[in-house]
Amino acid sequence: MDALRLANSAFAVELFKQLCEKEPAGNILFSPICLSTSLSLAQVGAKGDTANEIGQVLHFENVKDVPFGFKPITSDVNKLSSFYSLKLIKRLYIDKSLNLSTEFISSTKRPYANELETVDFKDKLEETKGQINSSIKELTDGHFEDILPENSISDQTKILVVNAAYFVGKWMKKFPESETKECPFRINKTDTKPVQMMNLEATFCLGNIDDINCKIIELPFQNKHLSMLIVLPKDVEDESTGLEKIEKQLNPETLLQWTNPSTMANAKVKLSLPKFKVEKMIDPKASLESLGLKSLFNESTSDFSGMSETKGVSVSNVIHRVCLEITEDGGDSIEVPGSRILQHKDEFKADHPFLFIVRHNKTRNIVFLGKFSSP
């Protein structure tokens, strides 16, 4: 479990850095656990360089039995939909002309239940597109309509990866709605945009990351199954969003150091956090190629002979759509009466860009990773 967590974190960080290069000042959001689960399913049917590249990019070198490693995380996170509005949908759609081998079907059945679907891209393209769109819409309770953009599939599509993930959090401690005020959010040194700023005074786990002049806070969601970790620069110091130093120094090792519970302690905090919603449709293909997935998308070099005897099979497209919404909503915040008096309070005022992680606490896996740069 630990090896898989480290692998997932390393992949998350590397893909995040790729996405930041593409959009230095934009909001970023993706679900690393969705992508790595889907790619690990594709790896079961891959051989040779294709299988090796997936293993390297996803950092599976030290992970024993990858497919069953994902199963407890996936089933655990799926159970959380009774506490939160949370869905992680991962699908591999395969054209029926591939005649999947019985070995591939049986080896993926248990660890990837419901994640593999055979469809007809070749002869019933429009019908298949409609089926995928309506299926994802239903699975995400209507959050995502028409997940497949124009020209995302063709009658030549053999393998399609579709991820759809959304989360509307409910906090352990509710933010009082009467305290939410419009405030300026500094998107850089000179410009601001108005934002609805939520305010709460309570005890949270707080830490300082001196190397990058940042603070980090852990905000638990209801029942503490998930937490949001926010890394906030003490000020906007660069000419961009103020996150350049974090993005430069971020790697799998530094992320582990920054989020290590031993570097944080409980403190009384005066917290200000914007209400926000980030919805992203990312096309991770180019980023995954940059990380080393060279043959996966290339018909002339990909090898999916572990899945089918058909030659020239590659992954045609990866659709990754995610949405995260943060509001005041949460449980009743019970603070001890009188405990506020005469106590020093730390301030955590997220009125400028920050990096955030939504973590599954039991397995410490990253469910969502992103940055909020602008309302």
From Swiss-Prot:
InterPro entries: Serpin_B9/Maspin (IPR000240), Serpin_CS (IPR023795), Serpin_dom (IPR023796), Serpin_fam (IPR000215), Serpin_sf (IPR036186), Serpin_sf_1 (IPR042178), Serpin_sf_2 (IPR042185), SERPINB5_serpin_dom (IPR033836). Keywords: Glycoprotein, Secreted. The keyword Glycoprotein applies. The record marks R340, I341 as: Reactive bond homolog. It comes from the Eukaryota. GO terms for cellular component: cornified envelope; cytoplasm; extracellular space; sarcoplasm. Gene3D superfamilies: Alpha-1-antitrypsin, domain 1, Antithrombin, subunit I, domain 2. One of its GO terms (biological process) is regulation of epithelial cell proliferation. One of its GO terms (molecular function) is serine-type endopeptidase inhibitor activity. Its main location: secreted. Pfam families: Serpin. It is found in: Secreted, Extracellular space. CDD domains: serpinB5_maspin. Glycans are attached at N99, N133, N188, N298, N361. PANTHER family: SERINE PROTEASE INHIBITOR, SERPIN, SERPIN B5. Interacts with IRF6. Belongs to the serpin family. Ov-serpin subfamily. Tumor suppressor. It blocks the growth, invasion, and metastatic properties of mammary tumors. As it does not undergo the S (stressed) to R (relaxed) conformational transition characteristic of active serpins, it exhibits no serine protease inhibitory activity. This is Serpin B5. It comes from Rattus norvegicus. The lineage of its organism: Eukaryota, Metazoa, Chordata, Craniata, Vertebrata. The gene is Serpinb5.
